[in-house]
């Protein structure tokens, strides 16, 4: 007999009075004085569990069923019947229950049926998927990943894998993880007593990627519409609820596109993701709303129904300088916006999702297209209430002389970008793109404020367990 999932039963794909097999784990169990046990079993296919009715005439009732505790894995054969208390719900009347895995010493089981804080669960990343809250986050994450691919595929985008190991510093920052096979006790030095990277595995300095953007630009300049989707790494020594050392990004590049084109695409991508989550994960969203006491569904619907508010960087600075709020960092033109500035604009001033455009060139990456004023670049950041920046994008500098000027101004090593310069030397084309941080998006959708709760195995400063 082929086993069925609980989601199939709930969605009425399996009909009553039919003998079925299910596999799952015990959530809770209670025994009645009449010799009947009520076992709530879940299998992860949905938030809901199914109640299993186990009677004392089962051969292993005393030896096994009465000993069941939260977390035990079971295989159950039985007949589906409508609940006497609620005719819309099915119960499984067991004819056979096999215990596949016991919980050794239930009193020491870290993920018992009692409530646990999210902070506590972070110490048990390998076991926390067994909780309702992390199960809901996982299903939502899955739908978000699926919809990213589905949306872009329907728009004619081609997926291009970008390298994890790179010799490039895409963002021009020093916060990169170095990749090396050197024995720390025997690091070779050159004649200047500096590390001799020529003797390393790749013959040069290499890093874990902070972005796949530069690589997929080369494919956009021949395939027109491309994207990459994978993990990225930042060696930021920031032990906050907003930062991860390893996180997932979807990065999109489009040939012949301008800034407004990618802003519209980014908004439509987010809208479609939210629609899909509302459609596929409604029960999980309702559960999270009650658990966290926040209004998630209304928030997602508001984004879908309201257009992005466009704000020039200069206007954002004016608003922040003239407001009565005392910020930790006092702003002036030419400074980057911190999270407190972003949150003020999206949460308090506009009370909506916004996009800030045309930033000073000094605070943005070397590859962004210089505007006519020679002071700003054609860049845009989309901010969401409660989160801040969720998407960052720009027109890419397609003029070789301007690109060279910015490489020099940012004090980057010119020879490392020769291949990138080739894209401007041989049939250069206007193009634009953006990056979307998936974990921040999941944090927004689920309402979980700590980004470490929305990725299976979080990596951060001083934390690389599991």
Swiss-Prot record:
**Could you state one GO biological process linked to this protein?**
asparaginyl-tRNA aminoacylation
For molecular function, the Gene Ontology terms on record are: asparagine-tRNA ligase activity; ATP binding; nucleic acid binding
What does UniProt give as GO cellular component? cytoplasm
**Keywords for this entry?**
Aminoacyl-tRNA synthetase, ATP-binding, Cytoplasm, Ligase, Nucleotide-binding, Protein biosynthesis
InterPro entries from the entry? Aa-tRNA-synt_II, aa-tRNA-synth_II, aa-tRNA-synth_II/BPL/LPL, Asn-tRNA-ligase, Asp/Asn-tRNA-synth_IIb, NA-bd_OB-fold, NA-bd_OB_tRNA
The family database entries (Pfam families) matched by this protein are listed as: tRNA-synt_2, tRNA_anti-codon
| SUPFAM superfamilies assigned | Class II aaRS and biotin synthetases, Nucleic acid-binding proteins
From the Swiss-Prot or TrEMBL record, state where the protein is found: Cytoplasm
Q: What class of enzyme is it?
A: ligase
Instruction: Show the catalytic activity.
Output: tRNA(Asn) + L-asparagine + ATP = L-asparaginyl-tRNA(Asn) + AMP + diphosphate + H(+)
What the entry lists under Gene3D superfamilies is as follows:
Bira Bifunctional Protein, Domain 2 (3.30.930.10), Nucleic acid-binding proteins (2.40.50.140)
Enzyme Commission no: 6.1.1.22
Record has Transmembrane as a keyword: no
Please give the PROSITE patterns that the UniProt record associates with this protein.
AA_TRNA_LIGASE_II
What's this protein's family per the entry?
Belongs to the class-II aminoacyl-tRNA synthetase family.
PANTHER family, per the entry: ASPARAGINE--TRNA LIGASE, MITOCHONDRIAL-RELATED, ASPARTYL/LYSYL-TRNA SYNTHETASE
Q: How does it assemble?
A: Homodimer.
What is the protein name for this chain? Answer: Asparagine--tRNA ligase
State the organism named in the record: Wigglesworthia glossinidia brevipalpis
């Amino acid at each position: 007999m082929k086993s069925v999932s609980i989601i199939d039963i709930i969605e009425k794909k399996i009909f009553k009075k039919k003998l079925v097999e299910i596999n799952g784990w015990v959530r809770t169990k209670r025994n009645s004085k009449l010799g009947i046990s009520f076992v709530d079993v879940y299998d992860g296919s949905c938030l809901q569990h199914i109640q299993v009715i186990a009677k004392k005439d089962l051969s292993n009732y005393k030896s096994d069923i009465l000993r069941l505790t939260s977390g035990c894995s079971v295989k159950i054969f039985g007949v589906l019947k409508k609940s006497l208390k609620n005719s819309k719900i099915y119960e499984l009347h067991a004819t056979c229950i096999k215990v596949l895995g016991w919980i050794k010493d239930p009193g020491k089981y870290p993920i018992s049926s009692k409530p646990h804080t999210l902070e506590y669960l972070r110490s048990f990343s390998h076991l926390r998927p067994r909780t309702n809250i992390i199960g809901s986050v996982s299903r939502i994450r899955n739908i978000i990943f699926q919809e990213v691919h589905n949306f872009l595929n329907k728009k004619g985008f081609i997926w291009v894998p970008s390298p994890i190991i790179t010799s490039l510093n895409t963002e021009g920052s020093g916060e990169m993880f170095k990749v090396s096979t050197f024995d720390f006790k025997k690091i070779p030095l050159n004649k200047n007593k500096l590390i001799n990277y020529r003797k390393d595995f790749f013959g040069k300095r290499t890093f874990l990627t902070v972005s796949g953007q530069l690589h997929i630009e080369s494919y956009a300049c021949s395939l027109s519409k491309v994207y990459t989707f994978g993990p990225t790494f930042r060696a930021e020594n920031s032990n906050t609820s907003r930062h991860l050392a390893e996180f997932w990004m979807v990065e999109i590049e489009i040939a012949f596109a301008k800034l407004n084109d990618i802003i519209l695409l980014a908004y439509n991508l987010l809208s479609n993701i939210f629609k899909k989550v509302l459609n596929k994960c409604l029960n999980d969203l309702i559960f999270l709303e009650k658990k966290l006491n926040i209004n998630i569904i209304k928030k997602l619907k508001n984004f879908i129904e309201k257009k992005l508010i466009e704000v020039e960087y200069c206007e954002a600075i004016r608003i922040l300088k003239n407001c009565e709020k005392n910020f930790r960092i006092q702003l002036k033109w030419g400074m980057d916006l911190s999270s407190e500035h972003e949150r003020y604009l999206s949460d308090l001033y506009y009370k909506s999702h916004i996009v800030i455009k045309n930033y000073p060139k000094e605070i943005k990456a070397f590859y962004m297209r210089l505007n006519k004023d020679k002071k700003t670049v054609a860049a845009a950041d989309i901010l969401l209430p409660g989160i801040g920046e969720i998407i960052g994008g720009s027109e890419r500098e397609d003029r070789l002389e301007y690109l060279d000027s910015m490489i020099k101004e940012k004090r980057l090593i010119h020879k490392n970008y020769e291949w990138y310069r080739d894209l401007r030397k041989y049939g250069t084309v206007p193009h634009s793109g953006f990056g979307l941080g998936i974990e921040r998006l999941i944090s927004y959708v689920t309402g979980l404020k700590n980004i470490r709760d929305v990725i299976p195995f979080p990596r951060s400063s001083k934390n690389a367990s599991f």
